[in-house]
From Swiss-Prot:
GO terms for biological process: fatty acid biosynthetic process; phospholipid biosynthetic process. One of its GO terms (molecular function) is phosphate:acyl-[acyl carrier protein] acyltransferase activity. It is found in: Cytoplasm. Pathway: Lipid metabolism; phospholipid metabolism. Its main location: cytoplasm. Its EC number is 2.3.1.274. This is Phosphate acyltransferase. Keywords: Cytoplasm, Lipid biosynthesis, Lipid metabolism, Phospholipid biosynthesis, Phospholipid metabolism, Transferase. The lineage of its organism: Bacteria, Bacillati, Bacillota, Bacilli, Lactobacillales. HAMAP family: PlsX (MF_00019). Homodimer. Probably interacts with PlsY. InterPro entries: FA_synthesis, Phospholipid_synth_PlsX-like. Pfam families: FA_synthesis. It comes from Lactiplantibacillus plantarum (strain ATCC BAA-793 / NCIMB 8826 / WCFS1) (Lactobacillus plantarum).
Length: 348
């Protein structure tokens, strides 16, 4: 059985949306047990059926106003901290929360812990590809865990993203690209130029060079690596642009009188299809990849369908052994580096 620890109190619509999503997922996935961490009385009042759902009382809640690291260190009986601790103690295979993003990241780093050899875990998300019959989505990493990144971090994101694309999206020989301000090999600042060289020399990944943000949704790569500041800005830009453009088109159609309104009715299904295609919550939450177990941050406004998608995502991560695969890669890398150091120099 797969066991998932869940912060029942995190998110704009918690605990109702979380509980509703968990109950729907429980009915879909017979091999999964759910550990709900939160205020027992509140959860019990909302829960309709406790089959394969365990409630663990958490007296404290980390709010959106709490300073993340301080809250994780001080609120030991909060739902986020207790869920993360369950993973560390082997009581659960993974945990997720729609609550305070910084606290989820801090709990992942300080409690669940990094895989040996990984400098900084990063947040990975899946985004849609439009107007490309051969590709429907791509992975982008980092989208906000680390505002600043070293070349080594970007190189490791290429490896982590490759594992994610292969095992979660069934991408064969996923193309890895570095987000930059031009496609030429010599583009970018010192960090990006150094990262380009590292990625070019990395075994086990299919590095295809630099990519510009304007081409991301066209399917130019399966994995796009970037620092967390840029990745988060690009993600929000995509969200905002898609929302604004759809609104502009709808206004243009509906503001042209009766004929426009009739045309709008005919186009309604098309609008809904576009909205659905651009909704990346269908892929679940953002994964803090590089930890010893799956830790997923879902959007604060997540409702039951997104909770179900996140649980589906976690089940796939556990069943496809992404974390053990990543750990083995970096263990072998460190072993090879040590072996090269231990080789005695030849006598002249």
């Amino acid at each position: 059985m797969i066991k998932i620890a869940i912060d029942a109190m995190g998110g704009d619509y918690a605990p109702n949306a979380v509980i509703e999503g968990v109950e729907q997922a429980r009915d879909l996935f017979e091999d999964t047990v759910f550990l709900l961490y939160g205020q027992r009385d509140v959860i019990n009042a909302q829960l309709k059926n406790r089959d394969r759902i365990q409630i663990i009382n958490a007296d404290e809640v980390i709010t959106m106003e709490d300073e993340p690291v301080r809250a994780v260190r001080r609120k030991k009986h909060s739902s986020i901290v207790m869920a993360a601790q369950a993973v560390k103690d082997g009581q659960a295979d993974a945990f997720f929360s729609a609550g305070n993003s910084g606290a989820v990241l801090a709990a992942g780093l300080f409690i669940v812990g990094r895989i040996k050899g990984i400098d900084r875990p990063g947040l990975v998300t899946v985004l849609p590809v439009v107007r490309n019959a051969n590709q429907s989505n791509f992975v982008m990493m980092d989208i906000g865990a680390n505002a600043d990144s070293k070349p080594l971090n970007l190189q490791q994101y290429g490896v982590l993203g490759t594992y994610y694309a292969e095992r979660m999206m069934q991408a064969k020989h996923p193309r890895v690209a570095l987000l930059n301000n031009g496609t030429e090999d010599d583009k970018g600042n010192k960090v990006h130029k150094a990262a380009f060289e590292l990625l070019s020399q990395t075994d086990g990944i299919n590095f295809v060079g630099n990519v510009e943000s304007r081409d991301l949704l066209n399917g130019v790569a399966d994995v796009v690596v970037t620092d967390g500041f840029t990745g988060n800005a690009v993600l929000k830009s995509i969200e905002g642009t898609a929302r604004s453009m759809l609104g502009l088109v709808k206004d243009a159609v509906y503001n042209t009188g009766i004929s426009g309104k009739l045309g709008g009715l005919l186009l309604k299904n098309g609008f809904n299809e576009i909205r659905s295609q651009m909704d990346y919550s269908q892929y679940g939450g953002a994964v803090l990849l590089g930890l010893k177990a799956p830790v997923v941050k879902t959007h604060g406004s997540s409702k039951a369908p997104t909770i179900v998608n996140t649980i589906r995502q976690i089940r796939q991560m556990v069943s496809t052994d992404i974390v053990p695969g990543v750990a083995e890669y970096f263990a072998n890398q460190q072993a090879n580096q040590q072996a090269s150091v231990d080789i005695p120099a030849e006598n002249d």
